Swiss-Prot record:
GO terms for molecular function: endo-1,4-beta-xylanase activity. Glycans are attached at residues 92, 190, 300, 339, 545. It holds the Pfam family Glyco_hydro_10. The lineage of its organism: Eukaryota, Viridiplantae, Streptophyta, Embryophyta, Tracheophyta. The keyword Nucleus does not apply. The active site is at 325 (proton donor), 432 (nucleophile). This is Endo-1,4-beta-xylanase 4. Its EC number is 3.2.1.8. It comes from Arabidopsis thaliana (Mouse-ear cress). Belongs to the glycosyl hydrolase 10 (cellulase F) family. Binds to and hydrolyzes insoluble and soluble xylan substrates. InterPro entries: GH10 (IPR044846), GH10_dom (IPR001000), Glycoside_hydrolase_SF (IPR017853). PANTHER family: ENDO-1,4-BETA-XYLANASE 4 (PTHR31490:SF41), GLYCOSYL HYDROLASE (PTHR31490). It comes from the Eukaryota. SMART domains: Glyco_10 (SM00633).
Amino acid sequence: MKRFNYGFFHLVLFLISLLLLGSGICMDPFSYDQSLKSECLMEPPQTTANTGGEGVKELKINENGGIRNVVEGVDLREGNIYITSAWVKLRNESQRKVGMTFSEKNGRNVFGGEVMAKRGCWSLLKGGITADFSGPIDIFFESDGLAGLEISVQNVRMQRFHKTQWRLQQDQVIEKIRKNKVRFQMSFKNKSALEGSVISIEQIKPSFLLGCAMNYRILESDSYREWFVSRFRLTSFTNEMKWYATEAVRGQENYKIADSMMQLAEENAILVKGHTVLWDDKYWQPNWVKTITDPEDLKNVTLNRMNSVMKRYKGRLIGWDVMNENVHFNYFENMLGGNASAIVYSLASKLDPDIPLFLNEFNTVEYDKDRVVSPVNVVKKMQEIVSFPGNNNIKGGIGAQGHFAPVQPNLAYMRYALDTLGSLSFPVWLTEVDMFKCPDQVKYMEDILREAYSHPAVKAIILYGGPEVSGFDKLTLADKDFKNTQAGDLIDKLLQEWKQEPVEIPIQHHEHNDEEGGRIIGFSPEISLLHGHYRVTVTNPSMKNLSTRFSVEVTKESGHLQEVQLVIDA
């Protein structure tokens, strides 16, 4: 591997090595002041920390003939998580992706993240690696194949986390992004009603939902239904709403199975995200669609499909995967033109304007080697869709499927990916989370699910799993007798942990009169509650007739401390 040979490089390398190995200072991976933004700055922020060296030299990299190294010989420790950040800009191109790669001495390269860099201003490149070995690595920056590209890099930082430190940071973020401090203020007619009164708080519906996919087998098994409805309040159907399932023969629609599953969900207050209005992969079209060669004919049947399925379920879904996997594939673009996806989303928004319309892809958060669907490329595709004329008010969404390999997940890369996907400010969902069976499947799945839950951009998770009878062979949550597997125990644990337990709190005694002097005001202690809908009941053991019930929603928008006022007619 070629190295810089100009004189100042060795001094800069020494200073940056001190910075990386000594200070541990970097862009905080759990601070979202900048990580969810995509502004390009005229000057990168400068650290005020004592780093032991300048650490802010501008490294000018000509990506030509392999001259791209920035830092050599950084020692990693197996099991630790390393977050790396840098500010980058281009000097001879207007816009180009710039990526960060970690190179091991055995020749293996691990992609750490990338950013869409621009000429003349600085973009934050944030990524990292979860070490599955101990030993030295080199860090280098590169672009997407343009020889002679000139890249400037400043403020390279790396921070190491032990797993326990990472988990602690996750828990602290969860307190900020998933919970609010709440204080109840109650107005009573008389003091005797105030004294001894108790507030009972019961969560009816959490804002964040951990759901699970279902398939047609749930209609054939009472035990599967009972198992499912006792746990989950969010689902999507694996195949039953897809075009090949509802119109296997041209002109002969059959929604019987999808309708029955929809009825089951609605009867049990289970929310449904619609999965796949259209699929951009030719392989998964109905067989009769594959034979169509006339673009006008394909356009007509496509419009019929969209009108049929979206009107049928309008008002009954909480979102739609509109053009499934349209970063990996381009069947409709090849047949109908390059703007096919944008036009489809435009039509979908007119058919159902009140729900988010998702771009749903695989390998974006779970597999760093599939650069076709890198987070930057997914964001670019969504930007193309919403920037199409007339699409600026579309309610967009990003679906990251999350089919993880049976190895230690790269949580540093996953966090970078979620940061990037979240930069559009659309809701991000993990939509099909599973993992092939392996000895550490439960441990790895817990790492993945907690990583998603602790990220502010992620609004929901749907598992691709179920009991053995359901046929989900990767993430099996219960055996043939519906006894939990270890993976099932994990999911039950998280469902319980991410749901607010019922709680009772007293009304504090330091009451005072209101401004008119006609009522007595009491306050509850502050309490931390998960976001969601609650049933709040005020009772007094000494007053049998006092039992007043209220509905309260705890939301992020209410600020750090949410004041809830209740008027008690006693």
